[in-house]
Amino acid sequence: IQSRKYPPASEWNSISNPPYSYYLYYLYANIASLNNLRLKNNMNTFVLRPHCGEAGDPEHLISAFLTSYGISHGILLRKVPFIQYLYYLDQIGLAMSPLSNNALFLTYDKNPFYNFFKKGLNVSLSTDDPLQFSYTKEPLIEEYSVAAQIYKLSGVDMCELARNSCLQSGWEANIKKHWLGKNYMKGGVE
């Protein structure tokens, strides 16, 4: 007899919500099944990139590491170095939104974005709730402009962030190859 902590989704009858890991597993499993079907029909596939590590338990970051292509936010990685190291080793994409975090969770000067970038984690800049947190008509340009000014990012730094953004995107390989070059998966310089 196998005991389970949680029942299958079809048998969930608790008035409480299931934990984040439960939701994430079922999203992962269903997206994987859907992607298999889409591949057989020569269609593009989907990636799982949840909101994770902005608030909540650091355990969410472990669940996302095991199931996801990348995550949005990840600021809690600053509190759990061993999980941060796993994200570094596997180069799991972190689409970070320091301006959004500044309004809700963490002031800009305490945001780990730049620290993660200097350590070599696969970070990019993104927008989160641009209608709520942006002051311009170009919220992504705003994120890049503020980060460039605050952290004194060089042109090379900005190019690396843009490259990371392309790598993290859900675009097919031929699109990435067009924007990043035929050797875009190759590490180092030529």
Where do the PLM segments sit?
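Divalent metal-binding pocket/active-site signature
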Residues: 1-80
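Acidic (Asp/Glu)-rich catalytic clusters
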Residues: 38-41, 83-89, 116-120
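Short acidic/histidine-rich active-site segments
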Residues: 47-55, 121-139
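Divalent metal-coordination and catalytic microenvironments
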Residues: 51, 71, 94, 128, ...
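Histidine/acidic-residue-rich catalytic or RNA/ligand-binding cores of hydrolases
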Residues: 56-67, 81-86, 104-114, 133-146
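Glycine-enriched alpha-helix->loop->beta-strand junction motifs that scaffold or abut catalytic
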Residues: 63-71, 88-94, 119-122
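Extended C-terminal subregions enriched in glycine
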Residues: 74-77, 92, 96-106, 135-138
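Mid-to-C-terminal alpha-helical segments outside catalytic/metal-binding sites
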Residues: 78, 146, 152-190
